[in-house]
A protein has these predicted regions:
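Transmembrane beta-strands of outer-membrane beta-barrel proteins
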Residues: 49-51, 79-83, 109-115, 199-203, ...
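Transmembrane beta-strand segments of outer-membrane beta-barrel domains in Gram-negative
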Residues: 56, 115, 122-289, 378
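Outer-membrane beta-barrel translocator/channel fold
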Residues: 85-162, 282-320, 330, 417-424
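N-terminal secretory signal peptides that target proteins for export/translocation
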Residues: 1-17
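C-terminal outer-membrane beta-barrel translocator/porin domains of Gram-negative envelope proteins
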Residues: 226-361
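Outer-membrane beta-barrel initiation region
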Residues: 37-113, 118-125, 145, 156, ...
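Residues on the lipid-exposed face of transmembrane beta-strands in outer-membrane beta-barrel proteins
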Residues: 53, 67-71, 97-101, 155-163, ...
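Bacterial N-terminal signal peptides
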Residues: 21-32
Length: 428
């Protein structure tokens, strides 16, 4: 698990029809690039630390203020520590901390990560239903929401084993040595995991709970989850791949806290990246990125004593990455299927680099994207059903590489809402 994946999992900003959020994001960026807020006084030159303020506004929190920090190379060159937290005008608060990619002495190819997130949102916009966390929201379900209190707690541990094949066969292999700049050459992938790419097997334990607090009742939801993932990153760069593919399959076994029902979830994803020729002086890289993601819950049933995961852990669409024009978990059912496409452009023109360099920050490039998502949920895993009455969203965004972290800002539109989101890492 990488730093960006951990942060992406829980710490995000999403606004609904709210222009004010964009203003606060601009203010936050200006504050973050002020040298008074940066700390880099480390005795070890291999450690790089940044602490920045966070200022934003959205419909769930109102105006919020916080602090975020990351230290790269603490203890080990490939490792990182991070922490973020905020409080807001409507008494919302959240904190997240993590340690990423640490190795044990004399244990090769194993990387360990830990993550904690807690939040209290007294004015959270959630869907109207009689079973918060478990109500089915099918493909044709109406959009109805209300304000409710939501308390969330997440704890996660992960062990990652990088298989000794492909790129990892090289004695000098390191997770930190992959290209992150468009000028850096990327290895040409083959079609065999033995010869190229990074293959990993991940074991993950997660405990997550979410309480929905209404005037008349409190609904407690949550689950303990054990998850295995097998992935093959057959690209030349994790952040800006110009060619190649990625594939991942995962299985989750969960036990719900409140009814002790057990469930199982299967997920798969495959992505392809296709470089377009750059014939002009205004572009550094042009790429078309395509993705197919799917999920199925074989233990699913429709009864009140359901053997199915909560909506925030199950087969769902909407939110930050899949059907981005709908809010998180807008659609939730037994199965899900979604196509995603992006056109990504890194231009030669980058006005932030010179300004950031003077302040001691590294912002080597930004990337513009046009994207479209198309998919649906269904009560059974049926290929023909998936391709009937599919939901579509479209939008545009910008990605900025700042201090080695890729910050993604997306604006997406659907038939229900216009959404903007700020998050870490590419959508896929």
């Amino acid at each position: 698990m990488t730093l960006v994946t951990l942060i992406m999992a829980k710490f995000y900003i999403q606004s609904v029809k709210r222009v004010g959020a964009l203003c606060w994001l601009a203010v936050s960026f200006l504050l973050a690039t002020h040298p008074a807020w940066a700390t880099q006084n480390n005795s070890d030159p291999g450690i790089r630390t940044r602490v920045v303020p966070l200022v934003f506004s959205n419909d769930n929190t109102g105006v919020a203020y916080g602090l975020g920090g990351v230290s790269l190379g603490v203890g080990q060159p490939q490792a990182a520590l991070f922490a973020l937290g905020f409080t807001s005008k409507n008494d919302s608060k959240a904190v997240t901390v993590g340690a990423v990619n640490y190795k044990l002495p004399h244990v090769k190819r194993w990387y360990f990560s830990g993550f904690f997130y807690g939040s209290d949102m007294p004015q959270y916009g959630y869907f109207i239903n009689d079973m918060p966390g478990y109500a089915i929201r099918g493909n044709d379900s109406p959009f109805e929401s209300q304000r409710t209190g939501v308390n969330t707690l997440t704890k996660r541990l992960q062990a990652r084993w990088v298989l000794p094949i492909g790129a990892a066969k090289d004695p000098g292999f390191s997770l930190t040595r992959r290209p992150i700049l468009p000028e850096q050459p990327q290895l040409s992938p083959t079609t065999h995991p033995e010869q190229s790419g990074i293959s990993s097997l991940r074991f993950e334990w997660e405990q997550q709970s979410r309480d929905f607090i209404e005037p008349s009742k409190t609904s407690e939801t949550g689950a303990d989850v054990f998850r295995t993932k097998l992935d093959w990153d057959n690209t030349g760069s994790r952040l800006i791949p110009a060619s190649g593919s990625r594939a991942r399959i995962s299985t989750s076994w969960g036990k719900n806290h409140e009814n002790h029902k057990r469930w199982r979830l299967y997920e798969a994803s495959v992505s392809g990246f296709f470089k377009l020729p750059v014939k002009s002086a205004w572009a550094k890289q042009q790429v078309v990125a395509l993705n197919l993601s799917l999920a199925d819950t074989p233990t699913w049933n429709d009864d009140a004593g359901q053997a199915r995961p909560p909506d925030y852990l199950g087969a769902r669409l909407g939110g930050l990455s899949r059907l981005r024009g709908y809010r998180a978990s807008r659609f939730f059912d037994r199965s899900a299927w979604v196509y995603r496409a992006e056109y990504r452009l890194i231009p030669q023109w980058q006005p932030l680099t010179r300004f950031a360099d003077k302040l001691g920050y590294r912002i080597p490039w930004w990337q513009f994207a046009l994207f479209a998502d198309m998919g649906r949920v269904a009560p059974s895993f049926n290929l023909a059903r998936f391709h009937e009455d599919m939901k579509t969203t479209a939008g545009a965004g910008v990605r900025i590489l700042a201090e080695g972290l890729l910050i993604r800002v997306d604006f997406a539109h659907s038939d229900e809402e216009f959404l903007s989101a700020v998050i870490i890492d590419q959508a896929f």
